[in-house]
Design a protein with these regions (language model features):
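Conserved beta-strand signature within the Rossmann-like core of class I S-adenosyl-L-methionine
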Residues: 90, 177-185
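Conserved class I S-adenosyl-L-methionine
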Residues: 62-71
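A short acidic, Gly/Pro-enriched loop at the edge of an enzyme's catalytic core
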Residues: 137-148
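S-adenosyl-L-methionine
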Residues: 104-136
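Class I SAM-dependent methyltransferase Rossmann-like catalytic core
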Residues: 27-56, 60
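A short glycine-rich, Lys/Arg-flanked "PGG" loop and its adjoining helix->strand segment in the class I
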Residues: 80-81, 163-176
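C-terminal lobe and adjacent flexible extensions of AdoMet/dcAdoMet transferase-like proteins
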Residues: 253-273
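A short, conserved alpha-helix within the catalytic core of class I
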Residues: 134, 156-169
């Protein structure tokens, strides 16, 4: 079945794509079904669309890529093999030296370190940057990254009043001509982030305006992660839906049928000059 899927993807990319793009897509496909991934994470490929998402962002094997706050490392598992030979993946996780953070921010770096140690052939070249703004607010040298990626984090930065500072740091660390790729749970157009971000959603226009304030240029949007079944009106916010399913068994079939959230997928570029 996986071979059939790969053949279909390659056929789609052949319609106007060059050999390099096809090779990148094949590498992503191989990584997302890799033996280093759990069955649960592989099952989410159908919702998170890593081939379409990462090729839209312009991922290339020789890039320096910074992944912001990777959580359990779902996308890290895909990015690390693609970048392993020619590129550099930098995982920006919470800084355990910063006091007063929630407990999970101290546990997550430990889990990631253990994950990397368990599969050195996959993660042996991955670097870690500690990032807990405002106390620990640098992602690296200015102009050092080809691609910065943030998956489903931006609502939290609106909630914490840090969104502008964090996006400004993305712009600073990107090379001229570099790309910021954003995937974020999408609120209804015109909605106020102050009202929707606590439920995990932010409007697309609010994210575009945020990046533009940081000096980045909005280049394109993709509907690869769109989901029209997401009504965004749940008792426990976006976490009502898979994979969290915070309502437990209550209406589980209903929320499972909706699937993961409706997400914007946006590409921004740092001006070359």
């Amino acid at each position: 079945m996986r071979n059939v899927i790969l053949t279909m993807i390659m056929a789609g990319f052949a319609m106007g794509a060059n050999a390099g793009e096809m090779s990148v897509a094949a590498g992503i496909e191989q990584a997302m079904w890799g033996d280093h991934r759990s069955e649960a994470n592989q099952a989410r490929n159908r919702y998170r669309h890593p081939v379409g998402t990462l090729t839209f962002f312009g991922l290339e094997p020789g890039m320096t890529v910074i992944e912001i706050w990777p959580g359990g490392g779902w996308y890290t598992e895909v990015l690390a093999p693609v970048l392993n030979e020619e590129g550099q993946l930098i995982v920006a996780t919470w800084d355990p030296s910063v006091e007063g953070q929630p407990n999970y921010r101290y546990e997550q770096p430990k889990r990631m370190a253990a994950k990397f140690a368990d599969a050195p052939s996959v993660y042996g070249r991955v670097q870690t940057a500690y990032y807990s703004p405002p106390e620990s607010a640098s992602l690296g040298e200015a102009g050092s990254a080809d691609l910065v990626l943030t998956f489903r984090n931006t609502h939290g930065w609106f909630n914490g009043g840090q969104a502008d500072d964090i996006y400004a740091e993305f712009a600073r660390v990107l090379k001229p001509g570099g790309v910021l790729g954003v995937v974020q749970h999408r609120a209804h157009p015109g909605s106020d982030p102050a009202e929707t971000a606590p439920n995990g959603y932010v409007s697309q226009e609010a994210v575009i305006a945020l990046a533009e304030r940081a000096g980045l240029v909005f280049e394109a949007a993709s509907e690869v992660n769109g989901n029209p079944r997401d009504t965004r009106d749940y008792e426990e916010g976006v976490w009502t839906l898979p994979p969290s399913l915070t309502m437990g068994e209550r209406d589980r079939e209903k929320y499972t049928a909706i699937g993961e959230s409706d997400r914007m997928t946006l590409r921004f570029r740092k001006p070359a000059q």
